[in-house]
């Protein structure tokens, strides 16, 4: 674990390698699972306020689900999340001609129609945040549908925390990310020095 103020970052977040391979998985994380995207309380009002600008990007079935269930729902974990279409994909999901899932909210953001990119939990994935009384814990969420992302991460040599750099800065700020990155780099240098010392001792 790495601790930065009241944030605890699991070792897997900095050690495991990951890079989304959207061509391979087709955005399965937006489709699979029992719940929609976790939402922060502040995001509930945001979704309400941007809905009319996001709506033109959504599928008819997504619009129907949102207007029947609400822009957000209180799920069985007693937390807020995005609504689902027929208990499957997120209601804000769109699909391109290749069947790849995209985020309608992010499409509206990319077009310059809104300032909100997408729920921060989506932006941070595969990191999931658990909030406790005094700390927030950042964990790496392993999911078999992301096996291609793990392989691509190894190929590119990108650890989880670097892959979600923009999201971490969005959530916690530039200083938090730079501190985390410095700690990781320093740890790597120390480990490399230890290996070199061991090699010298063997010689």
Q: Can you annotate each of these PLM segments?
A:
Residues 1-203:
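Short loop/turn segments that flank or connect secondary-structure elements
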């Amino acid at each position: 674990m790495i601790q930065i103020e009241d944030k605890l970052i699991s070792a897997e977040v900095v050690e495991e390698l990951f890079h989304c391979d959207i061509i391979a998985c087709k955005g399965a994380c937006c489709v699979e699972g029992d719940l929609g995207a976790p939402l922060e309380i502040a995001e509930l009002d945001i979704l309400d306020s941007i809905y009319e600008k996001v709506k033109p990007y959504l599928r008819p079935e997504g619009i129907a689900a949102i207007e029947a269930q609400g822009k957000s729902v209180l799920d069985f974990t007693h937390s807020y999340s995005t609504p689902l279409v027929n208990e499957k994909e997120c209601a804000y999901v769109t699909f391109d001609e290749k069947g790849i899932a995209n985020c309608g909210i992010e499409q509206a953001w990319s077009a310059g129609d809104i300032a909100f990119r997408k729920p921060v939990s989506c932006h941070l994935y595969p990191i999931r945040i658990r909030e406790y009384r005094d700390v927030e814990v950042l964990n790496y969420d392993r999911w078999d549908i992301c096996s291609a992302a793990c392989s691509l991460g190894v190929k590119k040599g990108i650890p989880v925390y670097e892959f979600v750099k923009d999201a971490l800065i969005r959530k916690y700020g530039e200083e938090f990310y730079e501190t985390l990155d410095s700690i990781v780099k320093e740890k790597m240098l120390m480990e490399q020095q230890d290996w070199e010392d061991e090699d010298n001792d063997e010689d």
